[in-house]
């Protein structure tokens, strides 16, 4: 079936990427500022000057298309697959991508790039202006918004605060928080440890980005405002908005207060039919215990993880309370928009499978599963430790001890800047073994290939509870910088 064919062009689709998912460039020189890793590696002495242009505000920066060419590591925030895979999937399904003149009988898809640094109010307003231009091109047809992460936030702002409910018929929100992510506070407090690839750390890339992020109004708008996720060592709730001395400057604290105000203004109203696709069963930062020093200053935070999320956004925040349809998948925040199971559901919904009543699809409801590797980056030849925990949660939680788990390392793509790299001849495969001391926990190890690149660590889980389940975790193989 070709989903993009339509007897009438009664709507068009807009892809709204998430945080850091749009390219940014200098308006005057047209130089890509975010992010051209090959260019940075060719001229590392220029990295600091290039990145400084990202400091907000800087009106000489403009969006220049969506991230559509390579995987982006921004740890500990997320491992982001590129949106080109989503666009190509829709093209293969018969949709028309970014047409100058729409073809009758074809449903058009428009990727929307925006400056993700700026206040999400402004991004939502600009999205509205562009959607209305596209409506004119389509004789008044309404938009269907497919939005990932922060893209869902600006989509909701457009719909609820900029009159967009007259322009939008459906919203499809993928891993998009309505009540932020604790990881935003973790990044603001501790910074990034890897951005792009490890080699860039030699030039202070991660530290520079960590400094710049504190100047972005939008990042403070990703902080949870309803869920009290922080406590002191005395188990007292810690209000990070009232006690804002964890931030270094008065400007940072003003941005924090405006982030709170933004979310209070946006609220939880949904004026158009909304579908939530969300990830679960991934180790996700959901809470933190803060050690306080003199004057209530934060000394350190012990972050707590559970499987109730996609690795970045807690499940509670990714499931909008007013959404009519909700679909859960065992996926990461950074690949929810390209995962095969999610795309199958999206195809169904875009083909007209939407219901008017509340509809919920939940996978793994009777299976507690956690699959992970011990690191995100490995050197060639290094041992990759893999584990998976399985529990039957009906009627009560019991470890599953008779499962079979087959794990393989599947080539995904070269590291940024190494586009000529080719996949290894035979990636490793193993079967995980039951841990004799931990019922329900399966462990194993394999050797990272000598070929640098990005790989999917893929596990096929065989249990008696349901049909075979495939889960993945993305890792990178890269030599130690300077080694």
Name these PLM-found stretches.
Residues 1-146, 150-206, 311-315, 324-483:
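N-terminal non-catalytic accessory region
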Residues 165-343, 347-360:
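Secretory/organelle targeting and membrane-embedding segments
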């Amino acid at each position: 079936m070709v989903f993009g064919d339509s007897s009438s062009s009664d709507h068009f689709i807009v892809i709204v990427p998430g945080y850091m998912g749009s390219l940014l460039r200098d308006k005057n020189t047209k130089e890509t500022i975010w992010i051209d890793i090959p260019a940075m590696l060719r001229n590392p002495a220029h990295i600091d000057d290039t990145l400084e242009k990202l400091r907000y505000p800087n009106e000489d920066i403009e969006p220049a298309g969506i991230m559509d060419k390579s995987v982006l590591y921004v740890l500990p925030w997320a491992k982001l697959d590129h949106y080109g895979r989503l666009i190509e999937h829709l093209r293969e399904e018969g949709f028309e991508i970014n047409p100058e003149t729409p073809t009758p009988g074809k449903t058009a898809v428009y990727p929307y790039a925006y400056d993700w640094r700026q206040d999400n109010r402004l991004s939502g307003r600009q999205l509205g202006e562009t959607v209305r231009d596209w409506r004119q091109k389509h004789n008044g047809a309404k938009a269907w918004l497919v939005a990932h992460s922060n893209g869902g936030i600006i989509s909701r702002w457009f719909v609820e605060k900029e009159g967009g409910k007259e322009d939008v018929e459906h919203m499809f929100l993928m891993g998009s928080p309505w009540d932020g992510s604790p990881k935003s506070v973790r990044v603001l407090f501790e910074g990034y440890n890897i951005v792009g690839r490890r080699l860039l750390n030699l030039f202070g890339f991660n530290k520079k980005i960590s400094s710049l992020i504190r100047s972005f109004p939008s990042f403070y708008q990703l902080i949870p405002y309803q869920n009290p996720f922080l406590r002191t060592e005395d188990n007292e709730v810690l209000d990070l908005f009232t006690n804002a001395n964890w931030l270094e400057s008065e400007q940072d604290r003003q941005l924090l207060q405006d982030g709170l105000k933004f979310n209070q203004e946006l609220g939880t109203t949904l004026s158009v039919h909304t579908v939530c696709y969300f990830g679960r069963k991934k180790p996700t930062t959901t809470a933190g215990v803060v050690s306080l020093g003199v004057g209530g200053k934060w000394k350190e935070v012990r972050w707590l993880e559970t499987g109730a999320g996609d690795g970045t956004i807690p499940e509670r925040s990714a499931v909008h309370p007013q959404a009519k349809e909700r679909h859960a998948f065992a996926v990461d925040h950074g690949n929810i928009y390209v995962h095969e199971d999610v795309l199958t559901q999206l195809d169904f919904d875009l083909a007209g499978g939407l219901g008017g009543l509340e509809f919920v699809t939940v996978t793994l409801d009777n299976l507690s599963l956690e699959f992970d590797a011990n690191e995100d980056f490995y050197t060639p030849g290094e041992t990759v430790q893999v584990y998976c925990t399985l529990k039957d949660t009906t009627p009560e939680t019991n470890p599953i001890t008779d499962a079979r788990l087959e794990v393989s390392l599947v080539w995904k793509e070269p590291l940024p800047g190494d586009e000529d790299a080719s996949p290894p001849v035979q990636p490793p495969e193993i079967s995980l073994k039951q841990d004799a001391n931990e019922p329900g926990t399966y462990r194993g190890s394999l050797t990272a290939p000598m070929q640098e690149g990005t790989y999917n660590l893929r596990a096929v889980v065989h249990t008696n509870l349901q049909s075979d389940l495939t889960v993945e975790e993305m890792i990178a193989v890269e030599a130690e910088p300077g080694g």
